[in-house]
């Protein structure tokens, strides 16, 4: 768990649970809100340093069902994927309890990203994924520049340009029952214009390649 000074008592709860799960539950505490992307990068680096072969990312509010974790793992371990994506849109629209406006914005945002970047991925903004460690070792994590929701797009696009296999696994996304989304106009703007920046940068950037 990457904890950025949340005011809801998360760190205290985790510390209590760590006494029960000392070899399974870990937490990195950071000062202030440093952004979604930097939190994931911090977690990825920790996982690589501790020699994990498969690294997952997911929301902590149960919008992503932990029961789907073995399916993402199986896609990477046994079905040839380098990155397994828990996809809301690969078999239609599998989202529960979102307002129709939010569903449409997310769905067409993924369509937009797919069109601009040329990735054959239905859910380009998904945040439920499993990576083989080789992916995170190859894509130069310190070169990932976006901190908001565009981070999710940048990670997929970079892995794609490096030659890794991305596979979508259908899931049902259930909106959180408590709390509120952190989506804002600024985050949406970063994602919209960030996609164009990613495409333009890809014309001149030399991406590291997957080892065969």
Model regions and ranges:
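Short beta-strand/loop segment that forms part of the nucleotide-sugar
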Residues: 1-6, 28-29, 58
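A conserved acidic beta->alpha catalytic loop
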Residues: 3-12, 62
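Short beta-to-alpha linker loops that shape the active-site pocket of alpha/beta-hydrolase fold enzymes
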Residues: 5, 89, 172
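Alpha-helical transmission elements in cytosolic ATPase-linked domains
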Residues: 9, 13-16, 42, 71
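Short helix-capping segments at alpha-helix termini
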Residues: 19-24, 51
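Short, well-ordered coil/turn elements that cap or connect secondary structure elements
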Residues: 20-22, 78, 161
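Acceptor/aglycone-binding surface of glycosyltransferases and processive sugar-polymer synthases
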Residues: 28-49, 54, 66-149, 176-193
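Hydrophobic helical membrane-anchoring modules
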Residues: 118, 142-212
